[in-house]
């Protein structure tokens, strides 16, 4: 009897073990459709619905405006192809971080993680959630601005929801991304089809003399590109989750080749649709371009526009959280952040500590009043690191010849993108110099202080503080260090 019970328990243990993954690490659960959804869902946020006037205000004419939108899509595609070579050559998650590490060593990689994790990505997450909150609140406060406390509480709730979803399951996070990407493509399709119908009916007067009065100075064109490329930001998001892509050698470049041209086509056609209904002056005066379009074309069903803009923003926020959590995870794994941030949930197999940390920092940024100016001043730092990363691709063509390159782009593409990155970093400083850009550079360089204190020299007192914190957090969240996946 006892032998039978013992045998049964052993069989049960084997059955349980057979259902567990071989290693406690991030699993390859994302396919091509999820990859395309992350690219499209992260790039298309609230910008194209709310404020495409930023490009028009610098070009001051319809023709150059549409050309800029198309050119920005081409540049985003070229940049993403450079990242595709990097992502298939160095198949680690974390976006620019592992590429900077391989090309230049730990210091540039640490400065990237420092700037991205403390300011750039959390503020973007917070702004997207605040935008979502304002659109959800708007129908309940017709004729007046909703109270800030309501907006901020709802934004914090959105951050909590998205962080929870992505901490619970990789698959659940990708399902949420797929659903909201589908929802935003529905409203994009409605706007495009409505605009093309109006265009076919002869509403073309706003396209007559479309280059008249164009502002073609170097400063104006550079700022137009700067604003347009900001709307395309997110083209590199798939490189943050390379380790979770099934067959990354195929799916990474394919998702880029499909996803970014799809976004480019949507952006151009949506702008065409806007101009069939509004003159350039009316578009510049509109507070929310898509809402104005809806009021003029979709009435009495115009209420669907703010609803789907809310879906769009929450989808962009989910994509940002999904990918940025992996950057914290990889930085923690390399010892550039608290070690516990690189740990994996035993039950969920997600980088839960990294996602929770990211959500907390983003929530802190909601507390102050207006942080849009902060994001604007730090946005040029993104192109600084894009440029450094793509330059690293050129450097590794000479220093890391032994690395396998399933995808190899012509060298002219990374050279061109490096020069464009330099231009985009310097253009706003030269055209409109302010002290804030200097403060931004000083903040990035201040990361060196933390690097030498806590990473390079690893003082004993710092280890004594971090070890008990790591141990208690590990027990609280049921997380363990990631294991190497045996080949």
From Swiss-Prot:
Impact when changing residue 40 to M: In CSNU; uncertain significance
The keyword Isomerase is annotated on this UniProt entry: no
InterPro entries according to UniProt: AA/rel_permease1, AminoAcid_Transporter
GO BP terms: amino acid transmembrane transport; L-cystine transport; neutral amino acid transport; protein-containing complex assembly
Effect after changing residue 44 to T: In CSNU; type I
Domain of life: Eukaryota
Protein residues bound to L-arginine: 43-47, 233
CC per GO annotation: apical plasma membrane; brush border membrane; plasma membrane
Outcome of substituting residue 230 to A: Abolishes amino acid transport activity
Annotated effect of mutating residue 286 to F: In CSNU; uncertain significance
Effect of residue 105 to R: In CSNU; type III; severe loss of amino acid transport activity
Stretches assigned to the Extracellular side: 56-62, 138-147, 194-217, 275-302, 432-434
Stated consequence of mutating residue 321 to S: Does not affect amino acid transport activity
Region (Disordered): 1-22
Pfam families: AA_permease_2 (PF13520)
Oligomeric form and interacting partners: Disulfide-linked heterodimer composed of the catalytic light chain subunit SLC7A9 and the heavy chain subunit SLC3A1. The heterodimer is the minimal functional unit. Assembles in heterotetramers (dimers of heterodimers) and higher order oligomers; the oligomerization is mediated by SLC3A1 likely to prevent degradation and facilitate heteromer trafficking to the plasma membrane. Interacts with CAV1.
Disease per UniProt entry: Cystinuria: An autosomal disorder characterized by impaired epithelial cell transport of cystine and dibasic amino acids (lysine, ornithine, and arginine) in the proximal renal tubule and gastrointestinal tract. The impaired renal reabsorption of cystine and its low solubility causes the formation of calculi in the urinary tract, resulting in obstructive uropathy, pyelonephritis, and, rarely, renal failure.
Protein name: b(0,+)-type amino acid transporter 1
Naturally occurring in which organism (per UniProt): Homo sapiens
Chain's gene name: SLC7A9
């Amino acid at each position: 009897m006892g032998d039978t019970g013992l045998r049964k328990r052993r069989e049960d243990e084997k059955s349980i073990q057979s259902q567990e993954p071989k290693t406690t690490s991030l699993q390859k659960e994302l396919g091509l459709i999820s990859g395309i959804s992350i690219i499209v869902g992260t790039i298309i946020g609230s910008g194209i619905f709310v404020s495409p006037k930023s490009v028009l205000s610098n070009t001051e004419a319809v023709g150059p405006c549409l050309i800029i939108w198309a050119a920005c899509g081409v540049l985003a595609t070229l940049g993403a192809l450079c990242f595709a070579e990097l992502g298939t050559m160095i198949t680690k998650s974390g976006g620019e971080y592992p590429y900077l590490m391989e090309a230049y060593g730990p210091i540039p990689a640490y400065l990237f993680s420092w700037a991205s994790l403390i300011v750039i990505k959390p503020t973007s997450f917070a702004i997207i959630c605040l935008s979502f909150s304002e659109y959800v609140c708007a129908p309940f406060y017709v004729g007046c601005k909703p109270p800030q406390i309501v907006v901020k509480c709802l934004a914090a709730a959105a951050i909590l929801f998205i962080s929870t979803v992505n901490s619970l399951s990789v698959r659940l996070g990708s399902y949420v991304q797929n659903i909201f990407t589908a929802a935003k493509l529905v409203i994009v399709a409605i706007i495009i089809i409505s605009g093309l119908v109006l265009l076919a009916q002869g509403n073309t007067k706003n396209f007559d003399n479309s280059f008249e009065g164009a502002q073609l100075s170097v400063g104006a064109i550079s700022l137009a590109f700067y604003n347009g490329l900001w709307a395309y930001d997110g083209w590199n998001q798939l490189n943050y989750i390379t380790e979770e892509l099934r067959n990354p050698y195929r799916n990474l470049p394919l998702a880029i080749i499909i996803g970014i041209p799809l976004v480019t086509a949507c952006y151009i056609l949506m702008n065409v649709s806007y101009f069939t209904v509004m003159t350039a002056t009316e578009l510049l005066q509109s507070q929310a371009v898509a809402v104005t379009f809806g009021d003029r074309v979709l009435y009495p069903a115009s209420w669907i526009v703010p609803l789907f803009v809310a879906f769009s923003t929450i989808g962009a926020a989910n994509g940002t959280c999904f990918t940025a959590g992996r950057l914290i995870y990889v930085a923690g794994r390399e010892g550039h952040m608290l070690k516990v941030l690189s740990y994996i949930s035993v039950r969920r197999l997600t980088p839960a500590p990294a996602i929770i940390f990211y959500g907390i920092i983003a929530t802190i940024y909601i507390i102050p009043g207006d942080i849009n100016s902060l994001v604007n001043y730090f946005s040029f730092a993104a192109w600084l690191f894009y440029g450094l990363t793509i330059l690293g691709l050129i450097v590794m063509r000479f220093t890391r010849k032994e690395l396998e390159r399933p995808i190899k782009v012509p060298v002219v593409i990374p050279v061109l993108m490096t020069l464009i990155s330099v231009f985009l970093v310097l253009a706003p400083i030269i055209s409109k110099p302010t002290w804030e850009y200097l403060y931004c550079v000083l903040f990035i360089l201040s990361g060196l202080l933390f690097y030498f204190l806590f990473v390079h020299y690893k003082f004993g007192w710092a280890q004594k503080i971090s070890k008990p914190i790591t141990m208690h957090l590990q027990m609280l969240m049921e997380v363990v260090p990631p294991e190497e996946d045996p080949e």
